[in-house]
From Swiss-Prot:
GO terms for molecular function: ATP binding; protein-exporting ATPase activity. Belongs to the SecA family. Part of the Sec protein translocase complex. Interacts with the SecYEG preprotein conducting channel. Has a central role in coupling the hydrolysis of ATP to the transfer of proteins into and across the cell membrane, serving as an ATP-driven molecular motor driving the stepwise translocation of polypeptide chains across the membrane. GO terms for biological process: intracellular protein transmembrane transport; protein import; protein targeting; protein transport by the Sec complex. This is Protein translocase subunit SecA 2. Its main location: membrane. The gene is secA2. Its EC number is 7.4.2.8. InterPro entries: Helicase_ATP-bd, Helicase_C-like, P-loop_NTPase, SecA, SecA2, SecA_DEAD, SecA_motor_DEAD, SecA_preprotein_X-link_dom. One of its GO terms (cellular component) is cytosol.
Length: 796
């Protein structure tokens, strides 16, 4: 019933879109007769019509799409089909276009990018990795430039490249930018650490199209982008605590709920810890560092699995995205968890650094005036797209009917029986000449099967999502006759597999999937590797009671039923009841996995709300400071008065020595100690006296400046220093607070409420501290000039 309703709703959406397609087709017939020069001139004409208010982007869409369509044919030799026009309209409307593999998403995106670039505010195509961004940019750049727009890659594709002054600003001044979600996110954070207006480079984020949108803003939504700062005071307990945790027994010393990523000590575990570490009360204030390290070690030992959550690669812990299987080099778990995993693996513990700036992809893309997305599997995430981003998903029809045959799951009792049968089936397929793509959940499994096939004298390509460019080339060749490819779920994603000569007659590409993934969207993506653009093909998933999905998420006892293992394997495999039961277990386990994923993203979104609001307020304040261009004429007495009133109200008793000490520490190093005229019992009199000292020091500082220009720079720098130092402490504190709250095992709603309450309290403290440091910095900072005559500011 629900499926029928979804189809009906989608058809209604398509009906209104097809009316616009008709208008585009009418304009397409018109512009075919235009000369190249006339067609090129349309871009300038469109810009003028938008600027003058004659047209909006919406009213201009049919004509602009027709121009971009015709230009695509003349420049690229590709003419967007009607289904691509439908996708392009969905993208301009700010929604999610579900387009199947091979339907031409790259070309589809050019039309809304062109249209929105006409506003002069910039547009972005955001994808998952550097290779895809560069590939698509290089392919489409000639089209944009022929039409009179500027286009750029959002980064310089050189490892550890150091950008020159103004280079990033030049990049972001282009009309159309191809980049990655990670690059854009870090640029946003870096831009908001700029210490001058000239150092900022990122414009207002206007319009963006996200390729593989479900992967980026759903699956990766919880992964924060982090810029690290100074090292934290490092604990030396990681290895010691790891040895203690190794002695603990589940359900005796600790309890865990793997599905919820929860683990905690039981009473016997607490007693064991107190005995092992000779501590009277494990939960006393003195032992809190020890408790934190025990919690980290427990999570590292039992909730994070090698080759599932992370690889040990070249002596480092490299995280893995559990949903996509993609490696996340350079990404570290926060709050000491990364170091606990290093200790678990017997490695040297790396330095845990404080957090300077952070943002999640959820909040990054909410900064756009409008954004849309493309994916082959959007419908399965529609409710989440709508709840989190107010986006609807429109299923775009395929140009040709899908011919791929998705075979029923093949069911086995154990993973060993499954592997034997699967290898047998693959060998049979290979002997016919059909290309085979075997997809595994982990790199470890992929390496195992690749080795097995080589031992059977079957050459194969192994792809485990490590070298994106090389693997894109290898996956592109996976459709050739007789080819055998073994890959993880993310390897080569974004690259079409085209069938070689003679393969169509053999039945097309055979996709064999070693087990169901934790998310049904990923299953669909993997099946979609075969059968592009109406090609023949097939897909089949092999399942067993030993599969990770069942072991991790199933609440059924069937997998542990020893009677099953006493039955004859052939009899069991022919039992429809057994097959049906196992399929039910797998489907339920996958549903639980997906539900937990949704809940985890909802939780992450809840936690992010506080820091998101605070970040916006702090960055707005930074920008106001950067816009100061008349510091000489600014009156800072209101700021100073607030700070001095805080001081007198915080002191229980005001004495001469305390006031003199305060002046030395915050206002002037040269104070002459003359406070004879001050009535220390009158707080307002003390505030007035401090204001007088403040004004004297400000006047002295201004006198020491060479010009109003340098005084302006001085004020900007000292205020930014105050904001940044306090914000750095606040961000790091919130990261630690979130980690501590996440370790609580019950009362989740109360824990989140408590987090927001403490976060608000700490923000108010930070705001007061910023004001205090501003006053201290503007009074006690000094400016000198280097050999080149450039100002150097020395902070107190």
């Amino acid at each position: 019933m629900k499926h029928k309703l979804d189809v009906t709703i989608n058809e209604l959406r398509l009906k209104s879109i097809r009316k616009i397609v008709k208008r585009i087709n009418t304009w397409s017939d018109e512009v075919k007769s235009y000369s190249d020069d006339v067609l090129k001139q349309k871009t300038l004409e469109f810009k003028e019509r938008i600027a003058s208010g004659v047209d909006t982007l919406d009213t201009l869409l049919p004509e602009a799409y027709a121009v971009a369509r015709e230009a695509s044919w003349r420049v690229l030799g590709m003419y967007p089909k009607e289904v691509q026009l439908i996708g392009a309209i969905v993208l301009h409307e700010g929604n999610i276009a579900e387009m199947q593999t091979g339907e031409g998403k790259t070309l589809t995106a050019t039309m809304p990018l062109y249209l929105n670039a006409l506003s002069g505010k910039g547009t972005y195509l955001i994808t998952t990795n550097d290779y895809l961004a560069k590939r698509d940019f290089e392919e489409m750049q000639p089209l944009y430039e022929w039409l009179g727009l500027t286009a750029s890659l959002g980064f310089v594709d050189i490892v550890d490249y150091e950008y020159q002054k103004g280079e990033k600003r030049n990049i972001y001044e282009h009309d159309i930018i191809y980049t990655t979600n990670g690059r854009l996110g870090f640029d946003y954070l870096i831009d908001n650490l700029a210490d001058s207006a000239e150092g900022k480079f990122l414009p207002q984020l206007n319009y963006g199209i996200i390729d593989e949108v479900d992967s980026i803003i759903l699956d990766a939504a919880q992964t924060p982008l982090v810029i690290s700062g100074a090292p934290r005071l490092q604990s030396n307990l990681f290895h010691i605590v790891k040895e203690f945790v190794d002695t603990l027994i589940e359900d005796v010393h600790f309890k865990m709920k793997k599905t919820k990523k929860e683990i905690w000590l039981l009473n016997q575990g607490i007693e064991a810890a107190q005995s092992y570490f000779n501590v009277e009360d494990l939960y006393s204030e003195q032992a809190m560092v020890l408790v934190r390290n025990i919690n980290l070690a427990l999570r590292a030992q039992y909730l994070f699995e090698s080759n599932v959550d992370y690889f040990v690669y070249n002596g480092d812990i490299v995280l893995i995205d559990r949903i996509t299987g993609r490696m996340l080099p350079g990404t570290k778990l926060q709050a000491g968890l990364h170091q606990a995993i290093e200790a678990k693996e017997g490695m040297e513990v790396s330095t845990d650094k404080s957090v300077m700036a952070t943002i999640t992809f959820q909040n990054l893309f909410k900064l756009f005036e409008s954004f849309s997305g493309m994916t082959a599997t959007g419908k399965l995430g529609e409710s989440e797209f709508f709840d989190l981003y107010s986006k609807i998903v429109v299923q775009v029809p395929t140009d040709k009917a899908i011919q791929r045959i998705d075979e029923p799951d093949k069911v086995f009792r154990s993973v060993d029986e499954k592997n034997i049968a699967m290898i047998h089936d693959i060998v049979e397929l290979h002997e016919t000449g059909r290309p085979v793509l075997l997809i595994t959940r982990t790199a470890e499994a992929a390496e195992y099967f690749s080795k097995v096939f080589f031992q059977m004298d079957i050459p194969n390509n192994l792809l485990i999502a490590q070298n994106v460019a090389k693997e894109a080339q290898m996956i592109a060749e996976a459709g050739q006759i007789g080819s055998m490819t073994v890959a993880t779920s993310m390897a080569g994603r974004g690259t079409d597999i085209k069938l070689g000569e003679g393969v169509e007659a053999l039945g097309g590409l055979a996709v064999i999937i070693h087990e169901h993934m934790e998310n049904s969207r990923v299953d669909r993506q993997l099946r979609g590797r075969s059968g592009r653009q109406g090609d023949p093909g097939s897909s089949c998933i092999y399942i067993s009671l030993d599969d990770y999905l069942v072991k991790r998420w199933s609440d059924s006892n069937l997998a542990e039923n020893n009677q099953l293992y006493s039955l004859d394997a052939q009899r069991l495999s022919q039992s429809s009841l057994f097959n049906r039961k196992v399929k039910q277990i797998v489907v339920k386990a996958q549903r639980i996995s997906e539900e937990q994923g949704v809940k985890a993203r909802e939780m992450a979104n809840e936690f992010e709300k506080s820091i998101s609001i605070q970040r916006d307020l702090v960055y707005e304040e930074r920008n106001r400071v950067l816009e100061i261009d008349d510091a000489e004429n600014r009156d800072f007495k209101v700021l100073a008065k607030d700070v001095f009133e805080m001081f007198v109200n915080e002191e229980k008793v005001l004495t001469k020595s305390r006031v003199v000490e305060y002046i030395y520490q915050n206002l002037s190093f040269q104070f002459n100690k003359d406070v004879a005229c001050v009535n220390f019992k009158d707080k307002q009199a003390v505030v007035t006296f401090l204001l007088e000292q403040f004004e004297k020091q400000i006047a002295l500082n201004r006198k020491n400046m060479q010009s109003a220009y340098y005084y302006n720079i001085f004020v900007q720098k000292v205020f930014l220093k105050a904001i940044d130092s306090c914000w750095l402490e606040q961000v790091d504190y919130l990261q630690q607070l979130k980690a501590n709250v996440n370790q609580r095992q019950n009362g989740q709603r109360n824990a989140i409420f408590e987090y927001h309450r403490v976060a608000l309290d700490s923000f108010e403290v930070m705001t007061r501290n910023i004001k205090k440091r501003m006053v201290k910095n503007i009074c006690q900072s000094m400016i000198t000039f280097d050999k080149e005559g450039m100002p150097v500011i020395h902070f107190p």
